[in-house]
Amino acid sequence: MHGRLKVKTSEEQAEAKRLEREQKLKLYQSATQAVFQKRQAGELDESVLELTSQILGANPDFATLWNCRREVLQQLETQKSPEELAALVKAELGFLESCLRVNPKSYGTWHHRCWLLGRLPEPNWTRELELCARFLEVDERNFHCWDYRRFVATQAAVPPAEELAFTDSLITRNFSNYSSWHYRSCLLPQLHPQPDSGPQGRLPEDVLLKELELVQNAFFTDPNDQSAWFYHRWLLGRADPQDALRCLHVSRDEACLTVSFSRPLLVGSRMEILLLMVDDSPLIVEWRTPDGRNRPSHVWLCDLPAASLNDQLPQHTFRVIWTAGDVQKECVLLKGRQEGWCRDSTTDEQLFRCELSVEKSTVLQSELESCKELQELEPENKWCLLTIILLMRALDPLLYEKETLQYFQTLKAVDPMRATYLDDLRSKFLLENSVLKMEYAEVRVLHLAHKDLTVLCHLEQLLLVTHLDLSHNRLRTLPPALAALRCLEVLQASDNAIESLDGVTNLPRLQELLLCNNRLQQPAVLQPLASCPRLVLLNLQGNPLCQAVGILEQLAELLPSVSSVLT
């Protein structure tokens, strides 16, 4: 077989590769050691740039070596002439571009480029925008490059309209571009700022309708791509609610004033200050949260001195001023009354969704019908199903309540991995609907039984509720936010899966608590109930703790004020 090329065996090939790797490793370690020695000795010269170039050219993610290069460049700035420094910077920019070709998603390389350009007196931002465009042509989802482009656009004061046009070009080329859609959500509010009186964070209606048409084209082209669906969800999002005092409640019995707000706030911080006026005179009080935790909360309360509740006067006027929101609310406590309150006459638009014009309602109704048609063609498309639900919520949550629940069942079957999330979202929507119905009826009783709830939310909306029925659901716990229900007298929570009562604390009016057929294991889990001073009736039938020896004696010691315990 003379004259034929000898072919290496697999073992020989493996050995050759091993030797090659060892040689590269030795060179890598040798260069790295030399860099660190020079750095320790303070020899920050161009030889360090050469050594680090050898390493970073192959592995741009060595962050420490980028730090070394910055130290060298800072040193050379004081030693080089302007012409020499310009040549050095030009070479550094070229080296950075070569590193990005090795790894276009190198954190260290992009950061070093930002640092370098930030030190130049007159950077060539046009060149940097072209660089971004080239790398985004290779990978339009490179979020490192997108971050860098936003940095460049900010530094160069590129008009938002030009950047929006750039996203148009990329989206037109490929709808599946989450970064482009996200960038649009940042640019459009800059291009179309709302007046001070308008809803902040939202778009003018004509712009919104055009964007809805664009994104609809995207998800009809590729129904399974999630980026357009997420952008569509942002478009449907409600505006940031205006700061408001939702409800003000005064109790003579508890000598307490309670306030609920449109958003969580931390009273006592530099920006969040509450002032209390009683009969037009300022009163210094200490504010606290219902659950005693010093953290942002929708509900805050304070104790009132006896003088401010004197029943000899015909009435007392309480006014709370929220300085950050520049809003205030007042209520009157009449002689002979044990409580007084003032509550916003809220509508569903103010509480949970945006108010829709006739034109926008027509467009959303058309979108809903189109999504239903798409769902018939793509019956297992989870994004389409979820969007149908959200469109129904945006249009009329009460009108579409029954249909929405049916779509939730379909969505859970299509996407079983997110069943828990969908159960919680469904619970949230059901509770919102129940709050709306209660608002319209102007009652203080809320029935949430047999709704298959898995979570409780919006409890700050229930400040005035006296009777709450949560029985026959799938609740595993009662959240600390339950302490916001300062007027609650009767709580029915039987036939759930409740294991903890940590949230049932500091309810000053709670008299009856029904917890039949839950999963309460030990008497110790009832300890939080000791903070409810008026609790007299406690029904624990059907819970595992009822089987404990001497349970009645333990409960009598644990909850001495409860006169009737059913086990």
Curated annotation (Swiss-Prot):
GO biological process, one term: endoplasmic reticulum to Golgi vesicle-mediated transport
One Gene Ontology term of the molecular function aspect: small GTPase binding
PFTA repeats: from-to residues: 44-78, 88-122, 124-158, 159-193, 207-241, 363-397
GO cellular component annotations of the record: cytoplasm; cytosol; plasma membrane; Rab-protein geranylgeranyltransferase complex
Keywords (A to Z) from UniProt: Leucine-rich repeat, Phosphoprotein, Prenyltransferase, Repeat, Transferase
EC number: 2.5.1.60
Catalysed reaction, written as an equation: geranylgeranyl diphosphate + L-cysteinyl-[protein] = S-geranylgeranyl-L-cysteinyl-[protein] + diphosphate
Annotated LRR repeat ranges: 442-463, 464-486, 487-508, 509-530, 534-555
Function per UniProt: Catalyzes the transfer of a geranylgeranyl moiety from geranylgeranyl diphosphate to both cysteines of Rab proteins with the C-terminal sequence -XXCC, -XCXC and -CCXX, such as RAB1A, RAB3A, RAB5A and RAB7A.
Family: Belongs to the protein prenyltransferase subunit alpha family.
Protein name: Geranylgeranyl transferase type-2 subunit alpha
Species assigned in the record: Homo sapiens
Lineage, top ranks: Eukaryota, Metazoa, Chordata, Craniata, Vertebrata
